[in-house]
């Protein structure tokens, strides 16, 4: 590879990491395209808590920009951040709608969580947790995340749908034909499958940027189907238009003000029991979702050292902690490291230049939101499904000849898609690893911190 001599080389150490400006930018675009859905989904979820939808969109983009820049600067890793899925739903539907708290109080809980994270990062507690997890279990986390994001892609494209009898099932084209919905949800399933096959072909052919090209190919097919009448948008059934909404003319490109949200934190309930419960729930999910993502993506990118440790992890964890605190002030739920970063890593992203590219695109999205919000779930699904495959290959590195290693790894892997949570997968893996190895008399393999984690996980299931 020709050595980069630019300012970017000096800042991001591109040659040292075996990459180039072109590769990093392409990787950043790919990561952003796979996570751009958050710009549409987060406002929809947070508005259910009574928050201004336009303001949430702007705050989401700014939080994504800020967090991802911090990741690039603090750690020089290709990981992107944004308000986390799952945590936003917990914020809106559990804390606000079910528990009856205001969104201002919920933001205060997120802020306090972020401050605690900063302290934990400064005192190396989060880094110690990362290093305490055994290497085989780290590989299992990577494989489990692969299944998890594949499942996200399959359900997002409605290839897999809910079924009252079997919980989930394949999409039924016959039922869609009979119900007259083939041109809404049915055709999008076809397009998603075509996108997966096209992306897989590009991967086999070793075409650079294959994941990004797969997204664009599927999106363009969707546009062609819509303009020819083969695809008929029906938002009530999750079938949205693939065309940018420019009905407001130039005003369509103006970002909404975040004044209804910024600084609106209510600490009046901070001493109550329920506030502590909410805070602990945010803490648990964010700590282990972030650690799981860092473990999985860095393992796939061969960033871990011989002992399974991630160099410069302290900077990555600090970026995540500061971003959460700042995001709460901006008016969004917990800002966290995105598993979709794996898409950019699969495209060759290895440094903070990938993250910086994502950050720039978050800012551009403020002014080009009609285009980014038009990227449909069926177009990003092929990226998630194929990246899921790439991450699942980490399973080949697990020692399945040792049952004390293999069974906890297996439980961690299957828990992630079935529980729809990276954190729960880590929880299952840690608890089973400690119990099985203790009963097998192999306590020398278990670090003291693993025992502590296992007890905390068990208490979490009892108390939260």
For the regions a protein language model found, what residue spans apply to each?
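Helix-coil boundary and interhelical linker segments in multi-pass alpha-helical membrane proteins
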Residues: 44-55, 94-105, 273-276, 376, ...
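Loop-to-helix transition at the N-terminal end of transmembrane alpha-helices
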Residues: 50-69
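Membrane-embedded alpha-helical modules
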Residues: 99-220, 356-464
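Alpha-helical membrane-protein architecture signal
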Residues: 18, 22, 194, 276-280, ...
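Juxtamembrane transmembrane-helix boundary signature
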Residues: 64-85, 116
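Helix-loop-helix hairpins and the membrane-proximal interhelical loops
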Residues: 2-55, 174, 215-313, 455-459
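Hydrophobic/aromatic residues within the transmembrane alpha-helices of Major Facilitator Superfamily
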Residues: 29-36, 69, 73, 150, ...
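Helix-loop-helix junctions within the multi-pass membrane cores of secondary transporters/permeases
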Residues: 3-42, 63, 84-93, 97-145, ...
């Amino acid at each position: 590879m020709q050595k980069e001599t630019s300012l970017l080389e000096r800042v991001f150490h591109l040659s040292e990491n075996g990459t180039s400006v072109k590769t990093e930018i392409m990787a950043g675009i790919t990561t952003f395209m796979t996570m751009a859905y958050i710009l549409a989904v987060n406002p929809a979820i947070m508005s259910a808590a009574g928050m201004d939808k336009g303001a949430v969109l702007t705050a989401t983009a700014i939080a994504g920009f800020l967090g991802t820049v911090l990741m690039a600067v603090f750690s020089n890793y290709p990981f992107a951040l944004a308000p986390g899925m799952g945590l936003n739903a917990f914020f809106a539907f559990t804390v606000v709608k079910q528990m009856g708290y205001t969104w201002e109080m919920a933001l205060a809980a997120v802020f306090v969580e972020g401050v605690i994270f900063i302290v934990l990062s400064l005192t190396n507690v989060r880094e110690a947790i990362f290093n305490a997890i055994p290497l085989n279990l780290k590989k299992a986390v990577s494989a489990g995340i692969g299944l998890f994001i594949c499942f996200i892609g399959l359900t997002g494209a409605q290839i897999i749908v809910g079924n009252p009898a079997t919980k989930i099932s394949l999409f039924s084209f016959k039922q869609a034909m009979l119900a007259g919905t083939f041109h809404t949800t049915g055709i999008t399933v076809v397009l998603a499958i075509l996108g997966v096959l096209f992306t897989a072909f590009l991967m086999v052919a070793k075409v650079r940027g294959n994941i990004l090209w797969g997204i664009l190919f599927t999106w363009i097919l969707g546009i062609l189907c819509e303009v020819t009448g083969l695809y008929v948008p029906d938002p009530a059934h999750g079938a949205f238009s693939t065309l940018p909404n420019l009905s407001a003319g130039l005003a369509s490109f103006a970002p909404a003000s975040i004044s209804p949200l910024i600084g609106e934190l209510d600490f009046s309930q901070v001493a109550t029991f329920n506030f502590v419960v909410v805070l602990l729930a945010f803490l648990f999910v964010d700590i282990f979702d972030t650690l799981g993502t860092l473990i999985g993506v860095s393992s796939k990118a061969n960033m871990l050292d011989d002992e399974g440790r991630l160099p410069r992890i302290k900077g990555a964890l600090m970026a995540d902690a500061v971003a959460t605190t700042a995001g709460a002030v901006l008016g969004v739920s917990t800002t966290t490291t995105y598993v979709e970063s794996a898409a950019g890593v699969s495209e060759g992203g290895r440094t903070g230049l990938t993250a910086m590219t994502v950050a720039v695109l978050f800012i551009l999205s403020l002014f080009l939101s009609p285009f980014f919000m038009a990227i449909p779930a069926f177009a990003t699904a092929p990226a998630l499904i194929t990246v899921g495959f790439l991450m699942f290959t980490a399973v080949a590195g697990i020692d399945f000849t040792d049952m004390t290693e293999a069974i906890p790894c297996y439980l961690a892997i299957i828990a992630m898609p079935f529980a729809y949570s990276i954190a729960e997968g880590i929880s299952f893996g840690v608890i089973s690893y400690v119990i099985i190895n203790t009963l097998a008399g192999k306590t020398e393999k278990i670090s003291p911190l693993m025992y502590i984690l296992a007890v905390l996980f068990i208490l979490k299931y009892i108390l939260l």
